[in-house]
A protein has these predicted regions:
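Extracytoplasmic ligand-binding site segments that recognize negatively charged/polar headgroups
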Residues: 59-74, 86-104, 108-245
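A bilobed periplasmic-binding-protein/Venus flytrap-type ligand-binding module shared by bacterial periplasmic
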Residues: 160-167, 204-208, 279-290, 309-310
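Short amphipathic alpha-helical coupling segments at ligand-binding clamshell hinges
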Residues: 73, 214-218, 289-301, 309-312
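Periplasmic-binding protein-like
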Residues: 142, 156-159, 185-195, 218-223, 228-231, 301-324, ...
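Extracytoplasmic "Venus flytrap"
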Residues: 33-45, 53-72, 197, 280
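A ligand-binding cleft/hinge motif common to bilobed small-molecule-binding domains
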Residues: 120-123, 247-266
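Extracellular/periplasmic bilobal clamshell ligand-binding domains
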Residues: 327-364
């Protein structure tokens, strides 16, 4: 060591560098999942990288469409961090939550990052999510991140009307919720019975924004409009409208209508404000077996670089500074201003009530 003080030889520098790397590796492997998740130190990135190199992969449970956005995100992340492989499982929120709960009850810890519109809250309520810190979360508004730190958001969904442009004239379009009660639309509308993207969420938005008394009074009037019901997804409902089976669909994803319109289909979307908005959330599993790689992945998804991949995949990025490819698909883009973001916690707490109301009032 005295020799190193006298002369900074190449050998001494190599020894010092080796000791530094060994320190970070030892630190990484002695840390708990919570330690890694909540790390805020100046050397955070270095610690995450050294730990992730040892872990080698990250397991991602998601409801996002694989070919449209999951693979591009995987490729973008692996290009940034070639020493980490992204593996994934795709399912809806219920399937993801069920899979995590089954694994955790068996003390089999496979998942690192959980994603979905309601999956994170469902898993969190079971006690199996970990609070985490990401420097990128500071760039997001309060409605797009959890105040307790359990989730952030990759993308948002806006539910609007979808209509067949051959069957509905521009001057006939409903422009308010009250317009749906016009005689013109009786028996001419369709919606999905899906809990996640159909009539129950529409009902929830009405009750949350109008209040229980006024909301239920409105819904009773809407019930008299004899809306056609289908167990099909919102995307499939839109396809039925494109085919001309019904002129108007309630509660479809506006970006789906945009994609079909640009492909030449006779369809467009119309917002009713406040627009129903839901959030695709992401978070860290409580016993994530690869927490360093998981935190790098979460950082990447929340970063502007990751959000731009979401953008070019024709999803609607959550980051307020990353617009949709078609800017008017998001609030403030020209077609609507007001959106009611239904948080996953509200969806978890009140979703069953909305389903019950729909089944009791609209299905009987």
């Amino acid at each position: 060591m005295t020799f190193c003080k006298r002369r900074l030889s190449a050998r001494c520098l190599l020894v010092a560098a080796t000791l530094v790397v060994a320190f970070y590796v030892r630190l990484a492997w002695s840390a708990t999942v919570e330690d890694v998740a909540m790390m805020k130190s100046p050397d955070r990135q270095k610690v995450l990288i050294e730990g992730a190199k040892k872990e080698g992969k990250v397991m991602f449970y998601t409801g996002l469409i694989v070919d449209q956005v999951v693979r591009p995100l995987k490729e973008g992340f692996e290009k940034e961090y070639p020493f980490v492989q992204v593996d994934f499982f795709r399912g809806n929120s219920e399937n993801i939550a069920r899979r995590v709960l089954t694994e955790y009850q068996a003390k089999r810890y496979e998942v690192d990052v959980v994603s979905g519109s309601a999956a994170t809250s469902m898993v969190q309520r079971a006690g199996f999510m970990q609070r985490f810190y990401s420097p990128h979360l500071a760039e997001y508004p309060p409605e797009l991140k959890d105040s307790k730190g359990f989730w952030g958001s990759t993308n948002v969904y806006f539910m609007t009307l979808g209509y067949n442009t051959r069957n509905v004239k521009a001057n006939e379009l409903p422009r308010t919720y009250e317009d749906l009660l016009q005689p013109r639309w009786k028996g001419q509308m369709m919606w999905s019975t899906s809990r996640g993207s159909g009539a129950p969420q529409f009902i929830g938005n009405i009750l949350l924004t109008m209040g229980p008394e006024a909301g239920k009074a409105y819904l009773q009037k809407l019930k008299a409009q004899n809306i056609a019901k289908s167990t099909a997804s919102a995307r499939q409902i839109l396809d039925l409208v494109i085919a001309g089976e019904y002129p108007l669909a309630i509660q479809i994803f506006n970006h789906h209508a945009y994609i079909s319109k640009t492909a030449g289909a006779p369809v467009d979307w119309q917002p009713l404000e406040p627009v129903t908005a839901t959030i695709n959330t992401i978070g860290l599993a409580k016993h994530a077996p690869r927490p360093h790689a998981a935190m790098l992945f979460l950082d990447f998804l929340l970063s502007k670089k990751g959000q731009k991949i979401v953008q070019v995949s024709n999803y609607l990025p959550s980051h307020p500074e990353i617009p949709a490819l078609q800017a008017d698909l998001k609030p403030g883009g020209g077609r609507f201003k007001k959106a009611n973001y239904i948080s996953p916690d509200v969806l978890y707490d009140q979703g069953n009530d909305w389903v019950d109301y729909f089944q009791n009032q609209f299905l009987k």
